[in-house]
């Protein structure tokens, strides 16, 4: 075949053949008036190179354990390899199965392999998979935004769609800044934020700067925005409230601390106070004390600052209301959500803004000066929209609220008397156990004891459930906890089985 083609034809053929053109584009310009023999020689060399590449790939696989070239967060040892998942059962390549009682990282709120969500994603793929958000909008994004804003009962005005919780926090920080630059007159001096100790808002540098977990920040000290982000105490009744102090007194103490921090930083320079409405992974599902956020909002309003609530973990139904701030009696200026938004079927996150900010943008520049390549991804929007419709149509938030109370009761009944369970707290389908060496003094175990990891591995390997470990619960270094977060459609019987297995894991690990 090749011997009968003209040299020019051969040049076009080789350039248009993906195997050759992408591997070595200059070849296209060197073939010239090649003979059929040289063409055969060339093709033989290319195929031989391809074979060598395959052999090299196999060598890498053979000599590196299972993967070797995949940069996992934990490299030694490599994690278990998931091969399939259905409902709440996860199957690994070694044949082991577990019941996922944490929904991954509070993500897979409907479980795995939901047919409705899969079909919604496929339907969107059949239309188009990607749209340049800088220039174009799309109906599926508009439908999702309408669904989400409707879920706030009109309290929020607009929603910005992206891929991760860290992106959402970065967006919130920039939105807060831009809000003050849209006002007339502008307030360019508002470049500071006040956040809390022990918090976590994401792993990108801006979001990590906002977080207050010592252990997670340590490696990157010197790169973080420490001149712009200032800190107050966590709202942690178990460790922060003094003996004999009432909740009301403790809340007032925290409000006074926030007020003093505004004064210290310069009240006219603060853009926002930032907090997780219910603290997630770093401190172990700690609900705010009654009245806390109303008191914090009052301080923010006093100084003209915004309230940013991070509900990446605790929001979208996880705690028994679609938004956790509904249970706190406040409406944030900016809110971030992610994990339960699309249930893990696609990477999706969102930032809500209220009418105050929306009005400022609309009467000002009419532009949000921010952007991500995959923001508002159509397939992700389709997944999130179907997940939220299922949650609404199947009344799953009410199921979380009702069975969440039962989950908390059973955990207290089964584990309150354990000598190393210092505190059990949570809300909805988001509960933690904090482990202590001494229950009376609340003294934590030594970090070197690795208690949270021990409980996690015991649950995984010996009991067959997922318990999510957390370290640094007390001060960012010492302290251990583990949390559970079942799928929203779990029944009362599911909860009973889960708690029984949680108790088994704790007793096996700690005695």
From Swiss-Prot:
Pathway given in the UniProt record: Secondary metabolite biosynthesis
InterPro entries with a match to the protein in the record: Aminotrans_3, PyrdxlP-dep_Trfase, PyrdxlP-dep_Trfase_major, PyrdxlP-dep_Trfase_small
Organism domain of life: Eukaryota
E.C. number: 2.6.-.-
CDD domains reported in the protein's UniProt record: OAT_like
Keyword annotations: Aminotransferase, Pyridoxal phosphate, Transferase
Protein residues bound to pyridoxal 5'-phosphate: 165-166, 310, 372-373
GO cellular component, as recorded: cytosol
Cofactor or coenzyme needed: pyridoxal 5'-phosphate
GO MF annotations, alphabetized: pyridoxal phosphate binding; transaminase activity
Modified residues (N6-(pyridoxal phosphate)lysine): 339
Chain sites annotated for binding substrate: 200, 371
The keyword Oxidoreductase appears for this protein: no
The keyword Cell membrane belongs to this UniProt entry's keyword annotation: no
Pfam families, per the entry: Aminotran_3
Family classification: Belongs to the class-III pyridoxal-phosphate-dependent aminotransferase family.
Matching PANTHER family: AMINOTRANSFERASE, AMINOTRANSFERASE CLASS-III
Function: Aminotransferase; part of the gene cluster that mediates the biosynthesis of the lipopeptide fusaristatin A. Fusaristatin A consists of a polyketide chain linked to three amino acid residues glutamine (Gln), dehydroalanine (dehydro-Ala), and beta-aminoisobutyric acid. The biosynthesis starts with formation of a linear polyketide chain by the highly reducing polyketide synthase PKS6. The gene cluster does not contain an acyl-CoA ligase or an acyl-transferase, and it is therefore predicted that the polyketide is transferred directly to the nonribosomal peptide synthetase NRPS7.
The protein's name: Aminotransferase FGSG_17085
């Amino acid at each position: 075949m090749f011997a009968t083609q003209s040299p020019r034809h051969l040049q076009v053929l080789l350039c248009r053949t993906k195997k050759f053109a992408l591997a070595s584009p200059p070849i296209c310009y060197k073939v010239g008036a090649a003979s059929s023999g040289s063409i055969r020689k060339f093709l033989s060399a290319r195929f031989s190179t391809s074979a060598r590449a395959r052999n090299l790939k196999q060598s890498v696989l053979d000599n590196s354990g299972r993967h070797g070239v995949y940069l996992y967060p934990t490299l030694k040892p490599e994690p278990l390899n998931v091969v399939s998942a259905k409902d709440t059962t996860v199957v690994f390549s070694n044949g082991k199965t577990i019941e996922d009682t944490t929904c991954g990282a509070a993500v897979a709120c409907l479980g795995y392999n939901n047919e409705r969500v899969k079909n919604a994603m496929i339907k969107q793929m059949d239309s188009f998979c990607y749209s340049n958000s800088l220039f174009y909008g799309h109906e599926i994004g508009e439908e999702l935004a309408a669904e989400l804003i409707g879920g706030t009962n009109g309290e929020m005005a607009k929603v910005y769609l992206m891929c991760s919780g860290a992106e959402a926090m970065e967006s919130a920080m920039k939105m807060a800044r831009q809000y003050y630059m849209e006002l007339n007159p502008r307030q360019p001096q508002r470049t500071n934020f006040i956040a809390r100790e022990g918090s976590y808002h994401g792993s990108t540098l801006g979001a990590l700067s906002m977080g207050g977990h010592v252990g997670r920040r340590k490696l990157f000290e010197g790169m973080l925005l420490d001149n712009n982000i200032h800190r107050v105490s966590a709202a942690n009744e178990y460790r922060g409230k003094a003996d004999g102090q009432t909740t009301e007194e403790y809340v007032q103490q925290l409000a006074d601390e926030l007020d003093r921090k505004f004064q210290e930083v310069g009240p006219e320079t603060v853009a926002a106070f930032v907090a997780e409405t219910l603290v997630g992974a770093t401190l172990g599902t700690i609900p705010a004390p009654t009245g806390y956020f109303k008191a914090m909002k009052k301080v923010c309003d006093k100084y003209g600052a915004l309230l940013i609530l991070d509900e990446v973990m605790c929001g979208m139904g996880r705690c028994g209301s679609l938004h956790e701030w509904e249970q706190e009696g406040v409406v944030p200026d900016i809110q971030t959500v992610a994990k339960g938004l699309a249930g893990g079927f696609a990477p999706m996150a969102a930032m809500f803004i209220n009418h105050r900010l929306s009005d400022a943008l609309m009467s000002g520049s009419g532009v949000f000066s921010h952007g991500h390549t995959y923001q508002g991804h159509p397939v992700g929007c389709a997944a999130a929209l179907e997940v939220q419709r299922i949650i609404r149509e199947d009344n799953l938030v009410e199921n979380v609220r009702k069975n969440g109370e039962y989950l908390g009761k059973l955990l207290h009944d089964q584990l309150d008397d354990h000598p190393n369970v210092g505190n059990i707290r949570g809300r909805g389908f988001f509960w933690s156990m904090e482990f202590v060496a001494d229950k009376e003094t609340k003294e934590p175990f030594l970090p070197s004891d690795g208690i949270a990891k021990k409980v996690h591995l015991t649950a995984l390997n010996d009991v067959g459930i997922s318990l999510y470990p957390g370290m640094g619960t007390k001060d960012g270094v010492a302290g251990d906890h583990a949390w559970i977060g079942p799928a929203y459609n779990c029944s009362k019987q599911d909860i009973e089985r889960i708690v029984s297995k949680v108790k088994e894991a704790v007793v096996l690990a700690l005695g």
